[in-house]
A protein has these predicted regions:
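N-terminal strand-loop element at the rim of the active site
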Residues: 7-11, 23-68
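Aromatic "clamp/platform" in nucleotide-sugar-dependent glycosyltransferases that forms part
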Residues: 261, 280
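Short hydrophobic beta-strand element within catalytic cores of glycosyltransferases
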Residues: 297-300, 310
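A short, well-ordered alpha-helix in the C-terminal region of glycosyltransferases
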Residues: 326, 333, 340-354, 363-366
Length: 382
């Protein structure tokens, strides 16, 4: 099977899932073509079954904004024709599902029809998709897809609530390869904390929805009760809030490490005692799942799909969005009881195993085969 994957190249959840899915399929012998504006962050281009096609947008003075969607549709059309792809998989409704539909119409003129799968990841539905400028286009592109998947039950519910979707949405959760989180040979905790200190960690793109200011406040509250350090991994617009916090709290500067983007995230997660995720919205909570795979319990909000991953009182604790006091108290409770912490570390790993790649990949493979079969049946009716 030859599969075209359309995705963002960034470190965000949708890009990571799309890349890991494509590489896993390539490892099983599928031919996988990535179409994006840049090389996806985690993509191993040395795999002989992986192909990358960069979308280039030519600048032209007439356009206030360069027409990426048109260039994307043209590249999809070209790749499908050149490599005889069997299926397209768009990760994120805008612009990928919309551009893929346009490419499908072009291909139909050549009598080269191809099925399209669209995976909904979150802000394409909960934020971007609900804006009046995009809503109708998002709804249209989803309904024009031949199969639709969502990364959580919560996101499926939101999609059906906000849009008039005429097709079934199949929930296929995000996944991780647990084996990547089992090697701690290079983990050196003493690089970040003293033996008598606990380590809290937060990983995100530091957008406002991640509420990094609450991460900092939680740590400030916890540090008063438990000797601890905070590690923040990621870059984004709210880094200014972090810098402002440090200016206002100079006594905490030596207790907070800012690492930016890191490649071997699992090595840092395995050093940590608690993962903080007070997000305003999370369609699934992939960062929380990665933490659990590294034996790290999660203190989080109950936003979106997080409760489907983080189980209250078992793998960590959840609180209402914005309830910094509750999240602080839960963290103090957990870090003050080594027996409870050890139990939750074990529970977190067991929960992560349920979302292992080996369990989720066959679901995608079956969905692909079914989509292609159904698409061919529909073509014979025309």
């Amino acid at each position: 099977m030859k599969i075209g994957i359309l995705c963002y190249p960034t470190y965000g959840g949708s890009g990571i899932v799309a890349t890991e899915l494509g590489m896993s399929l390539a490892n099983k012998g599928y031919e996988v073509h990535f179409i994006s504006s840049a090389l996806p962050a985690r993509l191993d281009i040395t795999n002989p079954n992986i192909f990358f096609h960069r979308v280039n947008v030519q600048t032209y003075p007439l356009f206030q904004y360069q027409p990426y969607d048109i260039a994307l549709s043209s590249m999809i059309y070209r790749v499908v024709n050149l490599y005889k792809l069997d299926l397209l998989h768009a990760h994120y409704a805008i612009p990928y599902a919309y551009a893929a539909f346009t490419a499908k119409q072009m291909l139909r003129e050549d009598h080269n029809d191809i099925p399209l799968v669209t995976t909904l990841h979150g802000t394409d539905i909960t934020l971007v998709g609900q804006h009046p400028s995009y809503k109708h286009a998002v709804e249209f592109s989803i309904n024009q897809s031949d199969a639709i998947t969502s990364v959580s039950e919560s996101l499926k519910k939101d999609t059906l609530q906000f849009f008039n979707i005429k097709k079934e949405i199949q929930v296929i959760t995000n996944f991780i390869d647990n084996s990547e989180f089992d090697d701690c040979s290079e983990c050196q905790r003493t690089q970040f904390a003293n033996p008598d200190e606990k380590i809290l960690i937060h990983v995100s793109n530091l957008r406002p929805v991640k509420r990094v200011d609450e991460v900092l406040q939680i740590f400030k509250n916890v540090e008063k009760k438990v000797k601890s350090k905070l590690i923040i991994i990621g870059e984004g617009p709210d880094m200014e809030k972090v810098n402002q916090f440090l200016e206002e709290n100079p006594d905490l500067i030596s207790k907070i490490r800012l690492l930016g983007k890191v490649n071997d995230l699992y090595k840092i997660l395995q050093l940590s005692d608690v993962f903080l995720l007070p997000s305003e919205q999370e369609s699934f909570g992939l960062a929380a799942l990665e933490a659990m795979a590294a034996y790290t319990p999660v203190i989080s909000s109950n936003a979106g799909g997080i409760p489907e991953v983080n189980i209250q009182g078992e793998t960590g604790y959840l609180a209402e969005i914005g309830n910094v006091e509750a999240m602080s108290n839960y963290t103090i409770k957990l870090l003050s009881n080594d027996e409870l912490l050890a139990k939750m570390k074990k529970n977190a790993k067991e929960q992560a195993v349920k979302f292992d790649l080996k369990n989720i990949l066959p679901i995608y493979e079956k969905m692909y085969r079914t989509t292609i079969e159904n698409f061919k049946k529909e073509l014979t009716k025309v």
